Regions:
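A structural signal for well-ordered alpha-helical segments within the folded catalytic domains
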Residues: 53, 105-108, 112, 135, ...
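Rossmann-like dinucleotide-binding domain that binds NAD(P)(H)
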Residues: 203-321
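C-terminal helical cap and adjacent loop that interface with cofactors, partners, or active-site loops
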Residues: 224, 229, 233-234, 241-246, ...
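Short helix/strand-capping hinge loops at secondary-structure junctions
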Residues: 118, 124-126
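Short glycine/proline-rich turn/loop motifs
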Residues: 92-95, 208-216, 388-395, 418
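N-terminal glycine-/serine-/threonine-rich beta1-alpha1-beta2 phosphate-ribose binding loop
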Residues: 3-119, 132-152, 417
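A contiguous active-site-proximal alpha/beta segment in oxidoreductase catalytic domains
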Residues: 10, 128-205
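Short mixed-charge
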Residues: 66-88, 177-191, 244-250
């Protein structure tokens, strides 16, 4: 199968040529794209949305960026509010790039409508949350190719320094050796994360929309955050290689389970006084909401056994936060990311010998690998910790999750100016969403 670059016309990288249209914003990620200004992007942004708290919260966040003391932005939001917001945007077309981050049940329909209309799409993940949505998304990618526009999702974790360096080290064959195959009981690639419903964003308590806890609108955990985890497995282990779902991916096991949300917790994070009717029908006998935000997938990727797992708690303990754990296993080295209490809830990178390999056998190859990184990442170092090595990462590379939205936006702007995505990116987006949605189908089937 031959993959070609997707062409996109009309952009040169000129100042202000990209005109954003934000459609039905309902998640704070829509605003994070605008936390900084971009020379290529016009300061005038067109917002189309139904009346309600979602768009109001979005506009407050943009206003917060415009009025902050340090490096304020200067966005000018032109807002249309009405039930016909989608039709109105498609008719007016004041911009050329649509920003999508909100209710995931509607998102895939928006993506397809935009692709059909010849509009570029820059979307938060997930771009679909079930098998029906995945079918629409696959059709949308085909329409985008036909109409010469680019659909792209925010894969912010590709800009996290520990992930970047993990990728560099596992692709250093002198250090890492061969990628291990693993097994269902002991996968060779593991990506796990823990998240929290109540958290702080840009220094303020995050207010989530009432529908966020309805998995038919937000999506279950196995199709939401796992999008990042599945993406990282492909991006790190098979860089710049197209993944074809039907040929390269086999779902072996999948499961889902709920986080129980009390009314007091729901009030705290949404600001609403009661569960809405669409959630009341899902409450248990004690009036508690089972929210299926947790999931696990065990699958093979080009013959390598991988596991992606996500868990949501309501709120992190004092001083704690979201966590991530990852390991990629090679014949000569295992490369870990750990982000727990021992790491002060900050992601840290480790290189450790697998069984049968002595620490001193790895030392020269690791030192050589770290020396080779100095041109791109000066200051990165290592220290022995008794189990292997801790990779020392200067603070200048730890810019934080919110800043990654600016980086992924810059990447997208470059692709627009280039007129194409990398040849592997669309096949891999197609494979990624086919993986997560098929896993959800299997998890539900296995419960019956």
């Amino acid at each position: 199968m031959r993959f070609t670059h997707q062409k996109c016309g009309g952009f040169t990288g000129a100042k202000g040529e990209v005109k954003l249209m934000t459609l039905d914003p309902g998640h704070f990620h829509a605003a994070l794209v605008q936390k900084t200004m971009y020379a290529q992007v016009s300061p005038t942004v067109y917002v189309y949305a139904p009346k309600g708290p979602d768009v109001e919260e979005h506009l407050k966040r943009i206003e917060g960026y415009n009025t902050r003391k340090d490096n304020p932005t200067s966005w000018q939001e032109k807002v249309y509010i009405g039930d016909d917001f989608l039709q109105k945007m498609l008719k007016d077309r004041p911009g050329n790039v649509v920003i999508l981050s909100g209710n995931n049940r509607k998102k895939t329909e928006y993506i397809k409508a935009c692709a059909q209309a010849g509009l570029n799409v820059f979307s938060d993940k997930p771009m679909c949350i079930d098998a029906k949505g995945n079918k629409l998304l696959q059709e949308a990618f085909d329409l985008a190719a036909k109409n010469g526009v680019i659909i792209y999702d925010y894969m912010t974790e590709r800009f996290e320094i520990t992930t970047i360096l993990q990728k560099e080290l596992v692709n250093d064959k002198e250090l890492f050796g061969r990628q291990q195959k693993g097994s269902l009981e002991d996968p060779a690639v593991v990506k796990e994360s823990v998240h929290h419903f109540f958290k702080y964003v840009s220094g303020n308590p995050l207010k989530r929309p009432g529908w966020y806890f309805d998995t038919t609108q937000q999506g279950e955990g196995v199709v939401d955050v796992t999008t990042h985890l599945v993406d990282m497995a492909m991006w790190e282990c098979f860089p710049q290689e197209p993944i074809v779902y039907q040929k390269d991916v086999k779902i072996k096991k999948a499961k889902r389970w709920p986080t129980m949300i009390t009314l007091d917790e729901y009030k705290k994070v949404t600001g609403l006084e009661d569960f809405p009717s669409f959630l009341k029908e899902k409450l248990d006998d004690k009036g508690v909401l089972p929210c299926y935000s947790n999931g696990e997938i065990i699958y093979t990727l080009k013959g390598i056994c991988a596991k992606a797992s996500v868990r949501w708690d309501f709120q992190a303990p004092e001083g704690a936060g979201d966590t991530h754990y990852s390991v990629i296993k090679g014949s000569k080295a295992n490369v870990f990311i750990r982000q727990g209490k021992e790491q002060n809830y900050k992601p840290e990178l480790y290189v450790e010998p697998p069984a049968g390999i002595r620490e001193d056998e790895m030392a020269d190859a690791l030192k050589k690998a770290i020396a080779g990184l100095q041109s791109k990442y000066p200051g990165v170092g290592i220290e022995s910790n008794g189990q292997g090595w801790h990779v020392l990462i200067p603070d200048k590379y730890r810019i934080g999750h919110e800043a990654h939205f600016g980086q992924v936006t810059q990447n997208y702007l470059k692709y627009l100016a280039d007129g194409k995505l990398p040849a592997w990116d669309v096949p891999n987006m197609k494979a990624k969403y086919s993986t997560t949605t098929a896993a959800l189908e299997l998890a539900r089937k296995q419960e019956r």
